[in-house]
A protein has these predicted regions:
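A structured beta-alpha segment of the ubiquitous adenosine-cofactor-binding alpha/beta core
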Residues: 1-2
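Active-site substrate-recognition segment that forms the wall
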Residues: 6, 10-26, 31-112
Length: 112
């Protein structure tokens, strides 16, 4: 089957490159595009509730990145996110000890 379209939305998330590899041509003169998706891992951690309010907090870490603390599931706080380039199999993604330490250090500056 052959299809023609003015635009194609590749909504495959971290598998976008694999889906793109299955296409034969594109609108750039009949050849495959050479750009690759850049995968970035944004991890979160859930910890025992850090505050009593129903409000979310936005914190700025020493590296100027923004970290949020959101009430989660009643008894927890959701803390995130990290921003780490990722070059492995998306099916094998998991938070690293360094990311956990980063998020804990950021929150420790504001909550005791």
């Amino acid at each position: 089957m052959q299809l023609r379209a003015r635009a194609l939305v590749n909504a495959a998330g971290p598998w976008a490159d694999q889906v793109l590899a299955t296409t034969k041509t594109c609108a750039t003169g009949g050849t495959k595009r050479q750009e690759r998706a850049i995968l970035v891992k944004g991890s979160h951690i859930a910890v025992p509730r850090l505050h009593d309010s129903d409000f979310a907090y936005i914190l700025q870490h020493t590296d100027r990145r923004v970290i949020f603390v959101i009430p989660y599931e009643g008894k927890c706080s959701l803390i995130g996110t990290t921003d780490v380039n990722f070059h492995c199999d998306p099916a094998q993604v998991e938070i690293s000890p360094e990311e956990t330490q980063y998020l804990c250090a950021a929150v420790s500056e504001y909550f005791t």
